[in-house]
Amino acid sequence: MSNGYGDHMDDVCRDDIGRTNLIVNYLPQNMTQDELRSLFSSIGEVESAKLIRDKVAGHSLGYGFVNYLNAKDAERAINTLNGLRLQSKTIKVSVARPSSESIKDANLYISGLPRTMTQKDVEDMFLPFGRIINSRVLVDQATGLSRGVAFIRFDKRSEAEEAIASFNGHKPPGSSEPITVKFAANPNQNKNMALLSQLCHSPARRFGGPVHHQAQRFRFSPMGVDHMSSISGVNVASSASSGWCIFIYNLGQDADEGILWQMFGPFGAVTNVKVIRDFNTNKCKGFGFVTMTNYEEAAMAIASLNGYRLGDKTLQVFFKTSKSHK
């Protein structure tokens, strides 16, 4: 179950009798589950309230579910609380649907957007394809300006597929360049786990060719560089507190930590970089790791850098999973 609420949804019916389970979107990031329950209890008796959190990092995903004992209370909650302004958010309240395969993996990554487009502009652009569960436009923390990148989660995967078919390669109003629309990176992709497992249990790999520094494109930050000159194996920790660990494969022999800082720094906060080196030669074995604090910034980096050519190498970039430790 990808969204963590299947147990609460299995018995929900589509008719009026079962319209007691509500989905609440666009919740403030710091809102707690108790606060969610308290808000909706002001309308009527609440059977259960669940704030959906990331299973690994533990942070709120910005939506939750409230199940009333009485369908009339649920209807009144929609009429009363839908559109309520909480902090900087305007929440959306509607009847939830039963869990099914059709709602899995409906999260889109959009890049190349005009920097002037707001979150509402992006939603209005994609709204014709279906119900939007939540959205986010990434902004530069220093300037507050849009990075031209957004994430949109649709209600159904089929809606997301329609959006991709219609808008990938499309030029939105006010833009001279086409945008990229594709499914956001999934940190649990089986093929990623298989490749990483193979790398971690295989002999040292050798890759030739120089790494060309592209200083005009990337920002370099030497702070916190963790040199791996004496590492002989892979043992990179990943936990909710340490952030999101990204695996980079097919680096050249001369790749160093500075290159990784330069590549990933523009996408968000990087807390650690590691280049895995051969114990005897101190050359890069062909892969490394980057840890970022924010999932969506990490996903943006993956979407942008996977397939990127560094020197004469084409990089493979994806989330490292917990199963990769074994």
UniProtKB/Swiss-Prot annotation:
Gene that this polypeptide is encoded by: elavl1
Protein name, entry field: ELAV-like protein 1
Location of the protein in the cell: Cytoplasm; Cytoplasm, Cell cortex
Task: Tell me which species this is from.
Answer: Xenopus tropicalis (Western clawed frog)
UniProt keywords (A-Z) are: Cytoplasm, Developmental protein, Gastrulation, Repeat, RNA-binding
Keyword Repeat attached: yes
Tell me the ranges covered by the RRM domain, including all copies.
Answer: 20-98, 106-186, 244-322
| Main subcellular location of this protein, as a coarse class | cytoplasm
SMART domains, sorted:
RRM
Q: Which InterPro entries match?
A: ELAD_HU_SF, Hud_Sxl_RNA, HuR_RRM2, Nucleotide-bd_a/b_plait_sf, RBD_domain_sf, RRM_dom
